[in-house]
From Swiss-Prot:
BNR repeats lie at residues 58-67, 101-111, 371-380, 439-449, 484-493, 1088-1098, 1130-1139. It is a multi-pass membrane protein. This is Vacuolar protein sorting/targeting protein 10. SMART domains: VPS10.
Length: 1525
């Protein structure tokens, strides 16, 4: 019986195949000039629109015939958009221009409409476009206007609306919004838009969600705390969920993201899914009314595909659970028409890219495909049925590369036929496209059968009963010459030979897959730039027979592979009727969707979810949510609450008998969730590493993102985190890692191994490339020298590079390690110099080369390809590259003196001149502390005795050549590190420790400078300690009692500093108050803090602590560094108050405390030793991200009304709030505003330089060869004088002048103006160079210069005088006529000739000259008389003459005397009245013998203009005065 049945089945199958082979579809084709842009079906119709080159055409018979749309015309760059609701409507948008087109009858007729963009956008192209139905005839259109290449991603969004189905031109929506959506959750649809308010700097300072029912004639704002604080970046309607995506930090696009969800369209709650928007990707997937599905990107780089995590929510949309990790974000899709079935690709855990897995510069991804039939709760790999070499039990499965049937404008769909899927992929776990084959599934994707040996495109017709397949290419990678089709659901295939072979572009049928007609578009190879359009018609297969009920079979969706039973989702299971595969008929229900039957299921645990007061744990159990319970207690004001742990999923259809089997009520005491028991918003995470901590580093992967953290232990293991230390993965390197280097470019990391390979990452250790080393690291140490700006270039140095050895070699790569070229042999060190010095030669490289027992400095501008190596310096010790300078330490010929040379251009080196009394022995070292465009700070060792190491800090001039002493006896350690710190953000504030010898070793004291090292002072101690007790410093000078801080040489991590790179003015350090700095283990050691840039300090807490700054100083965190501890202290108000929190279950030994280098993160990590194992390290991640309820508001236009205030640093000796010659103001969070975080708020844009101050002594430092004496003045060093200065400077070649120094030079950072100029230099000529000096300063007196400077001005002057005399005096009667002019008679007697404007100007000049001459003469005579009177008074006091007599000056009455009759011997006239003293005393003495005053006083002396003629006459001849001795 079984045999007979098998034979019948085989016969029927063969018969079907023969019949299929005999059938051939009806096919038409046409060739179209140019390559088409798009081809699409209108929904539920046979109408097809085709966008070709410079034309748009329609077919109304499934692609058989075509008609060009004349209304649209010859448009060359257009976009087609279908209305998502109205299936009859579609749009044609033109990228260029403002005329667009619309159809309301599926393309039969078209009409134009115009959209007028803003004037500022008229020159842009149309990018993305979206269409929303609002209500009735209302249409909302979103258009993006984008800049042209290469700025095509810079787009501005505009929304337009029409209330009459675009019968008239749409209008601009009266709201400036980038995001709008139609909210259909309400009874009446409304438009929701995001409205941003920006300041003058372009920053979003406010973001609000506004709603309108009348196209924003009126609107209302929807309130939610998350909206007010952050920035809303997206609003969308997903099934029954209205979702608002908010960026927590308005000023950082990569900041954490929160999701707020509404089910009623009005009220929102914040979901518990918060994540870092580090890679700009959150993708919402097709969702059900019961659950919201989305993926969140975890990493991306230009060399790898984006990957992330798949999440689903509960029925409220507020609580999310993780479904799948490492998901390929481009290949995750829900299977259409079936609830709960998902297909996804995941990346393998191994982040190592092997050399053979790299092609075309990109890695072949290791991925695998998975399927879930229970909404993502469980996942299975895909089984292949007809491949014995790939069995699921052996770990082999199908890896689909693509499984979509139609790409419907950015939406992947699996096909319209339930349970029938098709796609291409490979066996194994790689994504090698060239090895792909095509597979088909008839059970919804659980099992697959190979049907073709290559990849191609496919489409389904008649609910899967017709399948067309077109390979991407034919033989030898040429065009496809045939298409394949199946009429029995893929069991057998027919072939049709194409009349015109082509490379297929699109294969389409009706959108619901119910038609038996298809349209294929492809590129024709032999026709230049042409497209072929094929129309296939299978309707006559099976003689047009329509299926009967007997031809159909019932098929269940989601059949479990374990027991063969259908799986229930949301309380129901689904089935549908499908044609039997061997039936010879068509369903022929065109435009009719597949009917799905629903059957109710009994309720199970899967139909329940956690109640609102519980949350899902990592183990999948509902546990109490303290935050929600606290809110419930507060709202109901009860002592106890009974709350259920679970509830049935909303809209679940399961058959429910009782909740008791699944729901448990728990009683809670509200006192446990209120008051001090309120749960903390600070989260603590814990990780453990094998081995002891040996190296760690943060790696920046974006401009404002440094959350990637790499940890290495002494076992050679590497652990990596991309979320700030919250979680780690061990990177599975096969080799032991010796160490790693982090490059200056974003994401660049190199791992050095003991073997013949190394690993390189370009995305912050998310993935690594494995490469061969140029020389094995086993030969010696390896050094990597990165290019400062080119991320693909670095230099590899390896080998035994000791002096006398020749095994060290330098190699260069330009492709980040894929290949190397040899640079130079015997190189100990190499560096790229050009980017540092910013010179035109972009390839300048320096190398320290070993040559026998000497080291030389080699340079090259073409990677040492010269015939001979150029050595710029022969005998060097080392070189240091700092910004704008390269400093080289050299030895003299006798090796008795260490010298330094400096270059600013990379080619010319200048000698470094130390102060004349500063001698350096050959074995003495110097350390380049730092450099800037203004100067170099250098520490020169003066005592290298073990245990007594110290030296002097020298500071250079602007070109790095001349140095002055800044501070003596500065402490250093045995390896050359110096107790020196420059405080971040503050200009020129330095801290250093000096040392003096003692029996115990060193006595160290801390000094601070507020003027860039010109002046140093001890730090004034606080008045009281942290317990309120007074320090015993009263009455003592600072030299005997001051604050001392442990410096750079005593830090366990040299990256720790007193100050922060972002918290301006905040300083923290460990130390003590007293005469000297005590050992760190001393009981007096405590933590001290300054909030004003080091002016004043206070003690925080006794003990020794690690410290760090978070969020630009809004969080200060300290943890005990000496004793085991399980808690840390933190401050949220800049150190005003401190709180304590536990981070560990038991005390641990803290090794270090760290956060991102910029101190802008709210995440910290605490490294600690493990008590359980002496060979492991613990890490505790402390996260304050949810600690602050809001972001601080900043209003740079009105700073007094926001959360910030201005703070001004100042010099302690200044009363003008000045530092470096100017008053500067920095923005800091205001006191009392400690409920907000700063984030990436651009505080630097609020920086103000209020004014430049007048220059004072604080703006100057001692000049070269001068030192600061105890009295604060600058004096010449011993043995130097001005002659030394002349001889020293003039002996240099090419020098013709020297300067007489004042001993002072202006500090380069100072911008002061005016005031006292301490540095006013006077140039002097070097002996024998007077001529060059005079020429340089314009002092040579050649004949030509004399002529130009003297004779030409005189010639011009006399010419002008003669012209005025000729036109203004001689022509008007000469000087005799002018002598008649009276100052008090106006111009009645003077009527000059005025024939033109020149005469007017000349005559006015003459008048003015007369008045000026008269007044000047009178003043001159008065001054002479006063001077004579003063002389007489002095002589009278000395020789007995008596004061009291008044002297008067006679002023001539008539101006004619000024010019004609005045006595020329005016000295005699003055002497006539010189015998009387002019009394100028304020309080004259009393005398007993007085003389009578003269009867006739000439009062015109004091009021010339008011005198009458009578007065003048009476005063003309006064009587002689008598004098009594």
């Amino acid at each position: 019986m079984n045999l007979r049945a098998s034979c019948i089945a085989a016969f029927l199958c063969l018969l079907v195949q023969l019949c299929a082979a005999d059938f051939s579809p009806e096919v038409t084709h046409r060739i179209v000039k140019g390559i088409g842009w798009d081809i699409s079906y209108f929904e539920d119709s046979s109408n097809v629109i085709h966008v070709g080159e410079k034309m748009v055409e329609m077919s109304y018979d499934d692609g058989v015939t075509w008609t060009e749309i004349e209304t649209i015309g010859k448009s060359s760059d257009i976009l087609v958009k279908f209305d998502p609701i109205n299936v009859n409507r579609a749009f044609v948008f033109s990228r260029i221009g403002d005329t667009h087109f619309v159809t309301d009858d599926k393309g039969k007729t078209w009409r134009s409409f115009k959209v007028q963009p803003k004037k500022s956008l008229k020159d842009r192209e149309l990018g993305m476009h979206h269409v929303f139905n609002f209500k009735d005839d209302s249409v909302l259109i979103k258009l993006e206007y984008c800049k042209q290449y290469p700025e095509a991603d810079d787009c501005d969004v505009s929304y337009f609306y029409s209330s009459n189905s675009l019968k008239s031109d749409p209008q601009l929506l009266p709201i400036d919004a980038k995001v709008c959506v139609v909210n259909t959750l309400l009874d009446e649809p409304t438009i929701l838009c995001v409205k941003d308010t920006r300041n003058s700097f372009g920053h979003v300072v406010k973001s609000e969600l506004v709603s309108s029912k009348d196209l924003f004639k009126t609107s209302e704002s929807i309130k939610h705390p998350g909206f007010d604080s952050g920035r809303i970046i997206d609003v969308r309607l997903e099934s029954s969920f209205l979702v608002v995506v908010t960026q927590k930090d308005r000023f950082n696009e990569l900041s954490s993201i929160s999701i707020s969800v509404s089910k009623d369209g009005k009220t929102f709650d914040t979901a518990d899914l918060a994540f870092q928007m580090a890679y700009g990707a959150i993708r919402f997937l097709p969702s059900d009314p019961q659950s919201l599905f989305l993926t969140v990107a975890a990493s991306t780089s230009k060399d790898t595909r984006p990957q992330g995590t798949l999440y689903s929510s509960d029925s409220s949309g507020l609580h999310f659970k993780k479904l799948l990790d490492n998901v390929d974000l481009g290949y995750s899709a829900r299977v259409e028409y079936v609830h709960g079935v998902w297909l996804a690709k995941t990346f393998e855990e191994d982040p190592i890219v092997e050399p053979n897995d790299d092609y075309f510069g990109s890695p072949i991804a290791k991925t695998s495909s998975h399927i879930s039939i229970d909404n993502g709760l469980t996942w299975n790999k895909l089984e292949i049925l007809n491949d014995d070499s790939c069995k699921l039990k052996d770990g082999c499965s199908l890896n689909l590369l693509r499984f979509d049937a139609i790409e419907d404008k950015n939406k992947y769909v699996t096909g319209p036929t339930p349970n029938i899927l098709m796609g291409f992929g490979i066996t194994g776990n790689t994504d090698n496209f060239f090895k792909a084959k095509t597979y088909i599934s008839r059970d919804g994707g659980l099992t697959w059968t190979n049907v073709f040996s290559g990849p191609g495109i496919h489409a389904f017709g008649d609910q899967g009963n017709v399948i067309m397949y077109v390979p991407f290419s034919g033989r030898n990678h040429g065009p496809a010459t045939e298409v394949r089709y199946s009429l029995n659901q893929g069991r057998s295939w027919g072939t049709y030979k194409l009349k015109e072979p082509c490379f297929p572009q699109e294969l389409i049928t009706t959108t619901d897959g119910t038609n038996t007609k298809f349209v294929l578009s492809g590129i024709v190879e032999h026709q230049q730039m042409s497209e072929v359009l094929y129309a296939f018609d299978f309707s006559k297969a099976f003689d047009g027979n329509k299926c009967k009920d007997s031809d159909m079979e019932k098929v269940y969706a989601r059949v479990s592979p374990k027991d063969g039973q259908p799986n229930c989702i949301y309380g129901f299971k689904e089935s549908f009727m499908r044609r039997k595969a061997d039936a010879r008929c068509f369903i022929d229900r065109t435009f009719e969707d597949v009917k799905v039957d629903v059957e109710q299921c009994p309720c199970t645990q899967q139909d329940y979810e956690c109640s609102p007061y519980f949350k899902l744990s990592e183990k999948g159990v509902c546990v109490p949510d303290p935050k929600k319970i606290a809110e419930k207690c507060k709202s109901e004001s009860k002592d106890t609450l009974k709350l259920p742990d679970m509830q049935i999923v909303a809209e679940n259809k399961c058959e429910q008998k009782s909740d008791s089997s699944f729901v448990t009520e728990t009683e809670f005491k509200c006192k446990d969730f209120t008051g001090e028991n309120v749960p903390s918003s600070i989260t603590i995470g814990q990780s453990e590493f094998d081995g002891f901590l040996s190296q760690y580093s943060y790696v920046a992967t974006g401009p404002d993102l440094s959350d990637n953290l790499i940890v290495k232990t002494d076992t050679g293991l590497i652990y990596a985190s991309n979320n700030g230390g919250t979680s780690f993965v061990r990177v599975p390197f096969k080799e032991k890692i010796r160490g790693f280097y982090v490059g200056p470019s974003l994401g660049r990391v190199i791992m050095i191994t003991d073997g013949d390979v190394f690993y390189a990452s370009n995305n912050g250790a998310n993935t690594f490339y494995k490469y061969k080393v140029p020389t094995s690291a086993s030969n010696g140490d390896v050094t990597i020298s990165f290019h400062p700006t080119d991320e693909s270039r670095f230099i590899w140095l390896s080998g035994n590079c000791a002096v006398g050895s020749s095994t060290c070699v330098a190699y260069h790569t330009e492709d980040f390690g894929r290949s190397f070229e040899k640079l130079i042999d015997n190189a100990m060190a190499c560096d790229y110099v050009s980017p540092v010095l910013d010179i035109t030669s972009t390839e300048l490289i320096y190398c320290t080369v070993v040559d026998g027992n000497k080291k030389k400095l080699a340079s090259s501008t073409n990677y040492f390809k010269e015939a001979e190596i150029e050595y710029v310096l022969d005998d060097i010790v080392a070189y240091a590259i700092k910004s704008n300078f390269v400093v080289v330490a050299t030895l003299d010929e006798a090796h008795t003196m260490l010298k330094a040379k400096v270059t600013a251009d990379g080619f010319v080196f200048a000698d470094v001149d130390f102060p004349s009394d500063f001698k350096i022995e050959a074995q003495t070292a110097f350390t380049i502390l730092e450099s800037s465009p203004h100067s170099i700070f250098m520490h020169v060792t003066t005592d290298s005795t073990s245990g007594h190491e110290k030296g002097a800090i020298l500071k250079s001039n602007s070109n790095g050549t001349y140095y002055v002493l800044s501070l003596s006896d500065v402490n250093r350690n045995e390896v050359g590190y110096v107790d020196y710190d420059r405080l971040g953000l503050l200009e020129g504030v330095l801290i250093a420790n000096t040392a003096t010898d003692s029996k115990e070793g060193k006595n160290k004291k801390t000094q601070i400078s507020f003027n860039d090292g010109s002046q140093w002072n001890y730090i004034a101690p606080p008045a009281v300690d942290s317990d309120g007790k007074e320090y015993a410093c009263k009455g003592q000078p600072l030299s005997k009692c001051s604050l001392h801080l442990h410096g750079f040489t005593e830090r366990p991590d040299y990256r720790d500093t007193f100050s922060s790179g972002s918290a301006v003015g905040l300083l923290i350090g460990m130390g003590n108050v007293g005469e000297y700095l005590k050992p760190v283990t001393d009981d007096q050691t405590a933590a001290f803090m300054s909030a004003d840039g080091g002016l004043t300090w206070k003690e925080i807490k006794k003990g020794v602590y690690h410290w760090d700054f978070g969020d630009q100083g809004t969080i200060l965190l300290l943890v005990d560094a000496a004793k085991d501890t399980d808690e840390f202290i933190f401050s949220k108000d800049e150190g005003a108050t401190w709180e304590t929190m536990k981070f560990a279950s038991s005390p641990v030994k803290v090794l270090d405390l760290a956060t991102v280098p910029s101190d802008t993160s709210l995440k910290f990590v605490i490294f600690a030793g493990s008590h359980q194992s002496q060979s492991s390290t613990q890490l505790f991640a402390v996260d304050f991200s949810q600690f602050f309820p809001r972001q601080c508001q900043v209003d740079l236009e009105n700073p007094e009304s926001d959360d910030f205030e201005y703070w001004t640093p100042m010099h302690p000796e200044s009363t003008e709030r000045c530092l470096f010659g100017h008053e500067a103001m920095y923005l800091r969070r205001a006191a009392g505003h400690d409920d907000c975080f700063i984030g990436s708020t651009p505080l630097d844009q609020g920086y103000k330089m209020v004014r430049n101050c007048t220059c004072t002594r604080n703006d100057y430092e001692c000049d070269y060869n001068y030192f600061r004496d105890n009295d604060g003045t600058c004096k010449l060093v011993k043995g130097m004088n001005a002659a030394n200065r002349m001889a020293e400077m003039c002996r240099k070649p090419g020098v013709f002048e020297y300067f007489e120094p004042t001993g002072y030079r202006k500090i380069p950072l100072s911008t002061c103006v005016g005031g006292k100029q301490f540095d006013a230099l006077k140039p002097r000529a070097c002996p024998g160079h007077e001529k060059e000096f005079n020429e340089a300063h314009g002092r040579d007196v050649g004949g030509s210069k004399i002529f130009i400077l003297i004779f030409i001005p005189l010639l011009v002057f006399f010419s002008a005088v003669f012209f005025v005399y000729d036109r203004g005096i001689r022509r008007n009667g000469g000087f005799q006529k002018l002598g008649q002019i009276r100052l008090d008679d106006g111009d009645d007697d003077f009527n000059p000739i005025e024939e033109n404007i020149v005469d007017v100007v000349v005559n006015k000049t003459v008048r003015g000259a007369i008045v000026v001459a008269a007044g000047t003469f009178a003043v001159f005579k008065t001054i002479r008389k006063i001077d004579r009177a003063m002389f007489d008074k002095v002589t009278s006091l000395l020789f007995g003459r008596r004061p009291g007599q008044r002297n008067y000056v006679r002023v001539p009455d008539d101006e004619d005397e000024l010019f004609g009759t005045f006595d020329e011997n005016y000295e005699d006239e003055l002497n006539e009245a010189a015998d009387v003293d002019f009394n100028v005393d304020e309080e004259p003495e009393e005398f007993t013998e007085l003389t009578a005053e003269p009867a006739n006083v000439d009062e015109r002396l004091f009021d010339i203009d008011d005198q009458s003629e009578d007065d003048a006459v009476s005063a003309e001849h006064p009587e002689p005065e008598s004098t009594h001795e």
